[in-house]
Design a protein with these regions (language model features):
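Bacterial N-terminal signal peptides that target proteins for export
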Residues: 1-9
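Periplasmic-binding protein-like
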Residues: 103-113, 197-223, 277-279, 317, ...
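Short helix-capping segments at alpha-helix termini
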Residues: 49-52, 148-154, 193-196, 264-265, ...
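Short, glycine-/small- and polar/acidic-enriched structural segments
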Residues: 25-165, 170-173, 177-184, 203, ...
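Pocket-lining segment of extracytoplasmic ligand-binding domains
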Residues: 85-86, 166-263
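N-terminal signal peptide c-region/cleavage motif recognized by signal peptidases
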Residues: 18-20
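Conserved C-terminal helix/tail region of periplasmic/extracytoplasmic solute-binding proteins
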Residues: 296-329
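Secondary-structure end/capping motifs
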Residues: 225-308
Length: 329
């Protein structure tokens, strides 16, 4: 933690003590491990923005074995960071998750291809193996292939789908012509492994018109019936977005704050600074209020994801402006 954090935390604690108030507790469950993808929350904690709102926030890192929906369902968090496809799937299956804010305005999903595989345009996909993440991340891909009219059955006229792990080995080892990458993470792992940008062709889901909303904030619907909870979440969202804007303006400092909070020691300064620079492009230009048009595009993409769609009908009540209206009134 930085000296600034201790100073602000101390001042906030004194203010709370003097007023006779006690901090409201909030537990946030992240979608993945501690990294710059979640910088705004760590910055809000480090810079005292949560304390200024009278909040005591616990940030729980995620990982490959952590499903945010399961955590909040079991009472392990008040609010979670999740991608909208996962949240909508959980809602259709009976877990009433509601999006209360959308810090990520744009998607970071992309398909990164080796030029020497012969893939430099979407028309080149047939006959090749493409690496795809599953666990809910596959649906935009299948929607894209459906839009292109390309089968995913491994036929000569279609593509072979490789269930990709969370690494870039299939591309480096030529097991796949293309793999799934995030603009802020795996793409740079490919570059750091020795490949040059000019040796690669990148297809961004945003550009292909099949991007779905990624890191949003979700709560259990029933909780929103309590005005006190809505007010608490408004404070949390307001402070979190203040953290995100600070991170956009101070990307290197934000990356260092993330590193300070990485208890695993697995992250590196170089990678986190690189990541923060890309993340800032995804959060820029929004105060965290969900754009209904982005929501509709996400739903439409998911409903056209081939023979096994993540949702089977248009959701109802899956998002609200109740929190952001209070936060930014």
């Amino acid at each position: 933690m930085t000296k600034t954090w201790f100073a602000l935390a101390g001042a906030s604690a004194l203010a709370l003590f003097a007023s006779g108030a006690s901090a409201e507790e909030v537990t946030l469950q992240l979608k993945w491990v501690t990294q710059a993808q979640f910088a705004g929350y760590y910055v809000a904690q480090d810079q005292g923005f949560y304390e200024e709102e009278g909040l005591e926030v616990t940030i729980k890192p995620g990982g490959p074995d952590v499903a945010p929906a399961q955590v909040i369902s079991g009472g392990g968090a008040d609010v979670v960071v999740d991608w909208m496809p996962s949240a909508l799937a959980a809602r259709e299956k009976g877990l009433p998750l509601v999006n209360i804010a959308q810090p990520f305005k744009r998607s970071g999903m992309q398909l990164t291809c080796r030029n020497d595989s012969g893939v430099t345009a979407t028309k080149d996909f047939p006959g090749h193996t493409l690496g795809v993440w599953f666990g809910g991340n596959e649906y935009p891909f299948f929607s894209w292939m459906s839009k292109l009219g390309i089968p995913t059955d491994g036929s000569p006229q279609g593509v072979t789908v490789l269930k990709q792990g969370f690494n870039v080995d299939p591309l480096l080892q030529k097991q796949a012509a293309c793999i799934s990458t995030m603009t802020y993470n795996e793409y740079w792992q490919v570059i750091d492994a020795g490949m040059k940008p000019e040796e690669l062709t990148v297809f961004k889901y945003e550009d292909e018109g099949v991007a779905t909303l990624e890191d949003g904030l979700y709560v259990i619907e029933d909780k929103l019936k309590d005005p006190a909870f809505v007010e608490k979440m408004a404070k949390f969202v307001r402070a979190s977005m203040k953290g995100w804007k600070w991170a956009e303006e101070n990307p290197d400092d934000a990356a260092m704050i993330v590193l300070d909070n990485d208890e695993t020691g697995a992250q590196t300064e170089h990678h986190q600074k690189q990541m923060m620079g890309e993340i800032a492009k995804l959060t820029a230009g929004t105060d965290g209020t969900l754009d209904p048009a982005d929501y509709e595009r996400t739903v439409e993409t998911l409903l056209t994801a081939g023979s096994d769609p993540v949702i089977t009908k248009k959701p109802e009540g899956a998002w609200t402006h109740a929190v952001t209206d209070v936060a930014f009134k």
